[in-house]
Amino acid sequence: MFDIGWSELVLIGVVALIAIGPKELPGVLRMVGQWMGKARKMAAEFQGQFQEAMREAEMADLKKSFDEVKEAASGFAGNNLMTSLQKDVSDALRVDALDKPAETSSTTAIEAPATSSEALTTPTTPEAPTPETFVEAEAHAAVNEPLAITREVEQAPVVAQDTAPSEAIKDAKAS
């Protein structure tokens, strides 16, 4: 603490022995030791209070951060989030609205099939494209966006080709 070496301690001891005297020296040393103990206790108490204040400040910061997160999370209440997700899913599932041309206001109601046999006889493969379909696709806002194209593949016999590849393979390689 004071960076005192052995030679300095010996010098202080000799001066104290001469100044105080051998008779009163043990009492003075005891009193100095008690003062040193009190000073150490006070320093430890101050350090403990300082650390406690730092912990309280950290806890206040953590509580403030927690309250901010809690407040932000309250905006995402279960009903609001689920309603938003359900709306997004229902919008994404409205493929029929994108596939059909715009209808007039008089034919906007969706009609249910008259009998259950009509619902069973609907084809699962799409109809062949008509020129109106291409016009509608070009007029759509997402005409330049990539599409996921799927098709039904029929099993065809494998024919060995000794000549140039067919047009289908050329198209597949080009894309």
Swiss-Prot record:
Main location: membrane
GO cellular component terms attached to this protein's record: TAT protein transport complex
GO biological process, one term: protein transport by the Tat complex
Segments passing through the bilayer: 1-21
Disulfide cysteine pairs (residue numbers): none
Keyword tags: Cell inner membrane, Cell membrane, Membrane, Protein transport, Translocation, Transmembrane, Transmembrane helix, Transport
Biased composition (Low complexity): 111-132
Stretch list, region Disordered: 100-132, 155-175
InterPro entries associated with the record: TatB
Subcellular location: Cell inner membrane
GO MF term (any one): protein transmembrane transporter activity
Topology class, membrane: Single-pass membrane protein
NCBIfam families linked to this entry: tatB (TIGR01410)
Family: Belongs to the TatB family.
Role noted for this protein: Part of the twin-arginine translocation (Tat) system that transports large folded proteins containing a characteristic twin-arginine motif in their signal peptide across membranes. Together with TatC, TatB is part of a receptor directly interacting with Tat signal peptides. TatB may form an oligomeric binding site that transiently accommodates folded Tat precursor proteins before their translocation.
Assembly mode: The Tat system comprises two distinct complexes: a TatABC complex, containing multiple copies of TatA, TatB and TatC subunits, and a separate TatA complex, containing only TatA subunits. Substrates initially bind to the TatABC complex, which probably triggers association of the separate TatA complex to form the active translocon.
Protein's recorded name: Sec-independent protein translocase protein TatB
Gene source species: Bradyrhizobium diazoefficiens (strain JCM 10833 / BCRC 13528 / IAM 13628 / NBRC 14792 / USDA 110)
